[in-house]
Amino acid sequence: MVTARDLFDFAGTFMEREFNGAERPWDVLGRIKAFLEEHLKPEIKGTVHPTAVVEPDVFLDEGVVVEPGAFIQGPTWIGKGSSVRQGAYIRGKTVVGAGCIVGHATEVKNAVFLDGAKAGHFAYVGDSILGKGVNLGAGTKLANFKLDAGNVILHADGQRIDTGLRKFGALLGNGVQTGCNSVTSPGCVVGPECWIYANTTVPNGIYEGHQILCSEGRRITSRRRR
């Protein structure tokens, strides 16, 4: 079974305890609210444009920039030097690390961005975790809800794993890159340093790291390690 350590470098990060305590990596999604209730102290240290809306129960660290028309609901915690760009919509229960981007027309809810993760343009990040240095190409959607409204079941190695979650988008390991208009189906666990090509729909499942995923198949080739 994949673990949080297989996907993410979280040592010394703001949610290290939550990651360490999770039996399964997607269990962290259910810990976000409790983490914020325990640690969040609302304060605005960054810069907020007058036309942006920042509701109560939000922490913005030093160097955070919130651009015109952005809307941030609480509870939300945003780390140093991150940007919330024009028209972004953060719907609460969100933890954003340092040097991250929540981009133009991007919607985020119940999610974690580890340091340096970027969702720059027209993305949907719901009930998901982005590892360090993840970059989502424009229009990337991390779908989080099944058409039958049932629990998300992971299909991997011939097994059916009930996650216990009705809403579960994707876990993208450190360094994952997605091309424009790519989509992950509800319940995608993608290992570190994978590339997802543009216009690809990734089926539900657990994917090892250092792979290239494209619309012609689940696994095309292994990437050469840098």
PLM region descriptions:
Residues 1-51, 193, 208-226:
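Terminal amphipathic alpha-helical/low-complexity segments used for targeting or macromolecular assembly
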Residues 3-23, 57, 69, 75, ...:
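N-terminal short leaders/motifs
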Residues 31-77:
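Long amphipathic N-terminal alpha/beta scaffold segment
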Residues 59, 77, 95, 171, ...:
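ABC ATPase A-loop
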Residues 66-68, 72-77, 82-112, 116-121, ...:
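Extended, compositionally simple hydrophobic/Ser/Thr-rich segments
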